């Protein structure tokens, strides 16, 4: 699962002539004691169902706190099976990044 970006990320002079069409969450950490979710994502592409980070992709970090944290934790916990919770959490986090204007694209 990744986000197909509306406009591909352009790393400019760091990787001349290349653009990265997708964003992928590579780490998500829920910290209940500080009531925050930390999301790390990268730009790159999917190649044969495997994530390939762009050569010059900066890792981006988003911290989710407050009411957004509470809402996301509640929506990610609506399943009884742990594998569904993790997949659901990733989808919810992608949607959050899109809704907040951090990413623009379609979840695939």
Where are these regions (language model features)?
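Viral virion structural and adsorption modules
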Residues: 1-40, 44-108
